[in-house]
Swiss-Prot record:
GO terms for cellular component: extracellular region. It is found in: Secreted. Keywords: Disulfide bond, Milk protein, Retinol-binding, Secreted, Signal, Transport. GO terms for molecular function: retinol binding. Lactoglobulin is the primary component of whey, it binds retinol and is probably involved in the transport of that molecule. This is Beta-lactoglobulin-1A/1C. Under physiological conditions beta-lactoglobulin exists as an equilibrium mixture of monomeric and dimeric forms. Gene3D superfamilies: 2.40.128.20. Belongs to the calycin superfamily. Lipocalin family. The keyword Secreted applies.
Length: 178
């Protein structure tokens, strides 16, 4: 009986851990993701994270630039005090090619779900340190013209995450070019 309970408990524990696994890219060429990108859609685990117009997470990716150390500089644009502002976020490389550590925007990890390097890139920022465990994802495109295939890839990728996500289209009028 003890053995059965131990086996059942172990099986449940393994099942819980399997739910937390996020499907990320196994390889990433940071040189190929360099350049201009446009945020075409956002998704959040908690819509209140993006409620306020000046929410710190309402930042739009404008470009990516790899550093010689293998880190990734992320050029963001956002509104502060009704004006356009730029911010550069440094994402530090980890042992996993598509996962980076960040210390900004109340988040602590950035990971890439998918990219073809030429037309789309799907990334998420996660705060696993807080009790709420928040997640914000963005669908990026090289051009402002987005086809249905990119939207579908984003929706499909979000379904694989461990928390339910709500998709919000990126509002072009909220974005600014600085």
């Amino acid at each position: 009986m003890r053995c059965l309970l131990l086996t059942l408990g172990l099986a449940l524990l393994c099942g819980v851990q399997a739910v937390e696994v996020t499907p990320i890219m196994t390889e990433l060429d940071t040189q190929k993701v360099a350049g201009t990108w446009h945020t075409v859609a956002m998704a959040v685990s908690d819509v209140s994270l993006l409620d306020a117009k000046s929410s710190p997470l309402k930042a739009y990716v404008e470009g990516l630039k790899p550093t010689p150390e293998g880190d990734l500089e992320i050029l963001l644009q956002k509104r502060e005090n009704d004006k356009c502002a730029q911010e550069v976020l440094l994402a530090k490389k980890t042992d996993i090619p598509a996962v980076f550590k960040i210390n900004a925007l109340d988040e602590n990890q950035l990971f890439l779900l998918d990219t073809d390097y030429d037309s789309h890139l799907l990334l998420c920022m996660e705060n696993s340190a807080s009790p709420e465990h928040s997640l914000v994802c963005q669908s990026l495109a090289r051009t402002l013209e987005v086809d249905d295939q990119i939207r579908e890839k984003f929706e499909d990728a979000l379904k694989t995450l461990s928390v339910p996500m709500r998709i919000l289209p990126a509002q072009l009028e909220e974005q600014c070019r600085v």
